Swiss-Prot record:
EC nos: 2.7.7.23, 2.3.1.157
Amino acids binding acetyl-CoA: A365, N371, Y372, S390, S408, R425
Taxonomic lineage of the native organism: Bacteria, Pseudomonadati, Pseudomonadota, Alphaproteobacteria, Hyphomicrobiales
Reactions the enzyme catalyzes: alpha-D-glucosamine 1-phosphate + acetyl-CoA = N-acetyl-alpha-D-glucosamine 1-phosphate + CoA + H(+); N-acetyl-alpha-D-glucosamine 1-phosphate + UTP + H(+) = UDP-N-acetyl-alpha-D-glucosamine + diphosphate
Organism field: Sinorhizobium medicae (strain WSM419) (Ensifer medicae)
Gene name linked to the record: glmU
Transmembrane segments: none
UniProt protein name: Bifunctional protein GlmU
Length: 456
């Protein structure tokens, strides 16, 4: 029988060092609240029950944690009296009798399933407490994990550590797994006889040992346990997340010319043999199929780019953009809530919004779908193999049939049938010899202005 597990996410901090109008756990990493990343990791570790300890911005934090993948119950911590006190905000849930209790933090968005599973494996092996630690490049300020043999005997805070203990680089990551059958008894034994009068979860190690139990430590990469308290740390975490995800995608067959300049969102999906040129930003909700090329300086969000399509350079795809196979959206084009058919070309200086563009159609430079009347949005429908001449304005709602041709510079306000040619502009007039007359008139007007100004 599988062991049951309750994960307790501590997210009740005041976030004062973040200097923000909202809780730090709501700040986005890769376009997603950092606490949502933590819940994702729990779901990946097959943990289905979560107790979320909240304080500031309780409703918003609970909403961000409810990703739909796990059952989350929000519990309000009214007083801030230390980590052990925070865990006991979930007393009723702990009392239900889970095999494992896993304590994690809401501000560690880089955590993955692996160390969480390792901690639970430690409990399954008969240990009472498992602490997740890391080897620190610079351990200054961290609590040291004092290990003898394979047992964890103490967690020593930096200020209390001896010179010898300060040389230890194995540090406390804060995350902990506790035997669910003993959790409440152990937590109730934690005292507050310290300078701050708070109840510290780290005391469990020595409490367990004093009762004849056993604690161990399992190691995770340092970056996975990186917490976030300031904007600078938020930027550092973003950088680490981006590096990790870029590396994963390149190993999966995505080419990035200058990966350090490509920015991804938490749900960016790039297929094998996609090529991404430098300085590309992927907002949430982007899917790019095999063989597509995203040229430099393009920005995509909420878009689907199908196989073999080309985007950019300097293109913007907004929510609802759907580019068909082998289609093209070129430089200085914006596409929003529009389908571009297979093989269609929108090559330059164009806005396509609330529209359907048929397969094989060519949209000339400077074309605009005029989709907004100041109150409502309207749809433009362009059939297959049509040709829209440069600098045309298509005033929606309007339909253009298959194979139709729109002359350059046209303003189209009425439907155009299939295979028709439409002109929507004033007829050109040529007046021979008129240019010198106009020039003389303009000169006279200019001289008159100068004389008038001098007389003032």
């Amino acid at each position: 029988m599988e062991r049951t597990c309750l994960a307790i996410i501590l997210a009740a901090g005041e976030s004062t060092r973040m200097k923000s109008a909202m809780s730090k756990v709501l700040h986005p990493v890769a376009g997603r609240a950092m606490i949502s990343h933590v819940v994702d990791a729990l779901a990946s570790a097959s943990i289905s029950d979560v107790a979320l300890v909240v304080g500031r911005d309780a409703e918003a934090v609970a909403a961000a944690a409810n990703t739909g993948d796990v059952a989350v119950t929000a519990l309000l911590q009214k007083e801030r009296l230390g980590t052990a006190h925070a865990v006991l905000a979930a007393r009723e849930a702990i009392a239900k009798g889970y095999d494992d209790i896993l304590v994690v933090f809401g501000d560690t968005p880089l955590i993955t399933a692996a160390p969480l599973e390792a901690a639970r494996d430690g409990l399954a092996a008969g240990n009472d407490v498992v602490v997740i630690g890391f080897q620190a490049a610079d351990p200054t300020g961290y609590g040291r994990l004092i290990v003898e043999g394979d047992a964890l005997v103490a967690i020593r805070e930096h200020r209390d550590a001896s010179e010898e203990e300060r040389r230890i680089t194995y540090c406390n990551g804060g995350l902990m797994a506790i035997d669910g059958r003993k959790a409440l008894d152990l937590l109730d034994r934690v005292g507050n006889t310290n300078a701050k009068g708070e109840y510290y979860l780290t005391d469990l190690v020595e409490i367990v040992r004093s009762l004849g139990g056993r604690a161990i430590a399992v190691e995770a990469p340092e970056e996975e346990l990186t917490g976030c308290n300031t904007r600078a740390e938020l930027a550092y975490i973003e950088r680490l997340w981006q590096q990790r995800r870029r590396h994963e995608l390149m190993l999966a067959g995505v080419s990035m010319v200058a990966p350090e300049t490509v920015f991804l969102s938490w749900d960016t999906a790039l297929a094998q043999d996609v090529l991404v040129e430098p300085n590309v930003v992927f907002g949430p909700g982007v899917r790019v199929e095999s063989g597509a090329i995203i040229h430099a300086f393009s920005h995509l969000e909420g878009a689907h780019v199908r196989a073999g399509a080309a985007v950019g350079p300097f293109a913007r795809l907004r929510t609802g953009a759907d580019l068909g196979a082998n289609s093209k959206v070129g430089n200085f084009c914006e596409v929003k809530k529009a389908e571009i058919g297979a093989g269609a070309k929108v090559s330059h200086l164009t806005y396509i919004g609330d529209a359907f563009v048929g397969a094989g159609t060519n949209i000339g430079a400077g074309t605009i779908t005029c989709n907004y009347d100041g109150v409502n949005k309207h749809v433009t429908r362009i059939g297959a193999n049509a040709f829209i001449g440069s600098n045309s304005a298509l005033v929606a709602p309007v339909s253009i049939g298959d194979g139709a041709l729109i002359a350059s510079g046209s303003v189209i306000t009425e439907d155009v049938p299939a295979d028709a040619v439409a002109f929507g502009r004033a007829r050109q007039e040529v007046k021979p010899g008129r240019a010198p007359i106009l020039r003389e008139r303009y000169k006279a007007e200019k001289l008159a202005r100068k004389i008038a100004k001098a007389a003032e």
